[in-house]
């Protein structure tokens, strides 16, 4: 039995990471009687090499194509060392970001040609796609207000409002193009309301 691959997406400040922890806990309770486990991971990162690349990607300035290539290099290692082995074992994987983030941030935000990203996606993922992608949708100005007092921003969090408008637009474009894979949640609500939606989704998986 092959496991399932769930990804959480959204612009910085949308709240996806908070809800991911709760969702993973609920899913593990559901899978435990079946002898399966939930592997929680993130991108960029997820492996020792990926975590080192994460530090470079979040804090070092670089050419936009270099940035995209490093994202996919980290992803190849992540798939080979974490994601695919877990799925092959019948376990479930939940990742805080995956390739949709690269299309949204490097494609939408940075303006990198989508066809170049698609070529890298095809090479690196070899057909692997998430079973379901949960997109936490939030207006950039609200997300920025949430982040203002949270912590010192990394280079992506410090980007302009226009950058995040483009990033959000690309996320929504991808969601509209793949409605069977994406679940779009309004992230500008109370936590309990969002968790209710996630609970309903969990029942369908």
From Swiss-Prot:
Keywords: ATP-binding, Kinase, Nucleotide biosynthesis, Nucleotide-binding, Transferase
A GO BP entry: dUDP biosynthetic process
Residues involved in ATP binding: 10-17
Pfam families reported for this sequence: Thymidylate_kin
Molecular function in Gene Ontology: ATP binding; dTMP kinase activity
Disulphide-bonded residues: none
Family matches, as InterPro entries: P-loop_NTPase, Thymidylate_kin-like_dom, Thymidylate_kinase
Stated role: Phosphorylation of dTMP to form dTDP in both de novo and salvage pathways of dTTP synthesis.
Protein's name according to its UniProt entry: Thymidylate kinase
Enzyme Commission number, as recorded: 2.7.4.9
UniProt KW Oxidoreductase keyword: no
UniProt cross-references to SUPFAM superfamilies, sorted A to Z: P-loop containing nucleoside triphosphate hydrolases (SSF52540)
Gene assigned in the entry: tmk
Family per similarity comment: Belongs to the thymidylate kinase family.
Catalysed transformations (reactions): dTMP + ATP = dTDP + ADP
């Amino acid at each position: 039995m092959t496991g399932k691959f769930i990804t959480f997406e959204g612009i910085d400040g949308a709240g996806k990471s908070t809800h991911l922890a709760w969702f993973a806990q609920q899913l593990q309770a559901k899978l435990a009687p079946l002898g399966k486990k939930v592997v929680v991971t993130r991108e960029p990162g997820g492996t020792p090499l990926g975590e080192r690349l994460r530090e470079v990607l979040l804090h070092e300035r670089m050419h936009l194509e270099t940035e995209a290539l490093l994202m996919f290099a980290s992803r190849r290692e992540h798939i080979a060392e974490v994601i695919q082995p877990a799925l092959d074992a019948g376990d479930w994987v939940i990742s805080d970001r995956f390739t949709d983030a690269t299309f949204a941030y490097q494609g939408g935000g940075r303006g990198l040609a989508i066809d170049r990203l698609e070529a890298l996606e095809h090479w690196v993922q070899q057909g692997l796609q998430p079973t379901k992608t949960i997109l936490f949708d939030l207006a950039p100005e609200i997300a920025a207000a949430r982040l203002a007092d949270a912590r010192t921003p990394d280079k992506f969090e410090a980007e302009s409002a226009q950058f995040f408008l483009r990033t959000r637009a690309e996320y929504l474009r991808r969601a509209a193009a793949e409605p069977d894979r994406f679940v779009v949640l309004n992230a500008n609500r109370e936590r309990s309301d969002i968790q209710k939606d996630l609970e309903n989704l969990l029942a369908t998986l």
